């Protein structure tokens, strides 16, 4: 399990980053993620920890993300999870319009994809699916499971909307241990139920 050390954008124990403006902190963390040493080993650690967690949880409909900007690529884990038991389904997010919660549409490894908003691939013509577990990419994350994203608020709005409809999913943040930071949550921030890094699950 990862320690609760405060980490700076250098990935080393350091002072809390709560005084750094979030936009600047995102830039630092994205640059750090893009230059991580031993990236294959780190990704293998995330993959193993995530696969084990998914087998522990009662997951039937798994929402995840198409990787951008050097995010951990969960497609391999999700593909193997789908194939390992009948009745499992997966879905990718679709932006219907800026400022709205995300929609999710069914995905399988052979699903045809088209470019969606921001050029991110989305499933082409598959039905909507309501996930009971969501894998959520983290630019940064804190020891108390708060997440720093890209600043668009899509996942915060989505989690809030799903909760309001009585369909609260289990939220699993995915990030690299070097991007663990001290983060003062803002009013709209919602903690993850779990966070997975190459250091383990907490």
PLM features: residue spans?
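Conserved phosphate- and dinucleotide-binding cores of soluble alpha/beta proteins
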Residues: 4-13, 100-202
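N-terminal active-site beta-alpha-beta segment that forms phosphate/nucleotide-binding
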Residues: 2-130
């Amino acid at each position: 399990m990862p320690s609760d050390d405060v980490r700076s954008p250098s990935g080393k124990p350091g002072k809390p980053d709560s005084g750094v403006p979030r936009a600047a902190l995102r830039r630092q963390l994205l640059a750090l993620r893009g230059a991580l040493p031993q990236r294959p080993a780190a990704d293998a650690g995330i993959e193993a920890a995530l696969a084990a967690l998914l087998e522990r949880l009662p997951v039937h409909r798994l929402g995840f993300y198409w990787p951008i900007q050097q995010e951990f690529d969960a497609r391999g884990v999700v593909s193997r999870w789908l194939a390992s038991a009948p009745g499992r389904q997966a879905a990718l997010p679709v932006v219907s319009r800026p400022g709205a919660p995300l929609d999710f549409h069914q995905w399988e490894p052979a699903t045809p994809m088209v470019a969606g908003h921001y050029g991110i691939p989305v499933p082409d013509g598959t039905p909507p699916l309501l996930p009971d577990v969501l894998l959520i990419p983290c630019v940064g994350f804190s020891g108390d499971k708060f997440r720093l994203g890209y600043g668009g608020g899509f996942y915060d709005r989505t989690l809030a909307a799903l909760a309001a409809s009585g369909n609260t999913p289990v939220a699993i943040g995915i990030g690299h241990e070097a991007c663990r930071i001290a983060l003062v949550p803002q009013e709209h921030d919602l903690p993850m139920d779990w966070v997975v890094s190459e250091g383990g699950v907490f």
